[in-house]
């Protein structure tokens, strides 16, 4: 049985936001998805929100503050360190992958370009969130 997830999507491209939202819609599961579109709004959003995400989807190329800096902030303090972060970006540069994984990202995924890719992404996100809930 699939579980509904609390997801924070940090993405500045409205078209990608729409694709992610469509992919995260499931006939049997209604995920709660919050969207933040600028890097400088992420931490204030998390601090003020009454809903704690079970997984964060983070683009690297964001306005105001780069995704790598956001990841560093999230993983350096106690408040949000335990929330799994999945990097979703067009970059596949080895330096970006290494930096993000060393900084505490759960997974680094190049943005899908088709519906099948987004469906696989939803499966990965669900597995990561469920693993963390079980103490993984």
What does each model-found stretch correspond to?
Residues 62-65, 74:
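Hydrophobic residue at a beta-alpha junction
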Residues 82-92:
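A short, hydrophobic beta-strand element within the central beta-sheet of small alpha/beta folds
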Residues 4-24, 56:
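Conserved acidic segment of CheY-like receiver
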Residues 113-125:
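C-terminal output helix
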Residues 58-59, 89:
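Active-site residues of response regulator receiver
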Residues 35-55, 119:
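Acidic, metal-coordinating helix/loop segments flanking the phosphotransfer/catalytic sites
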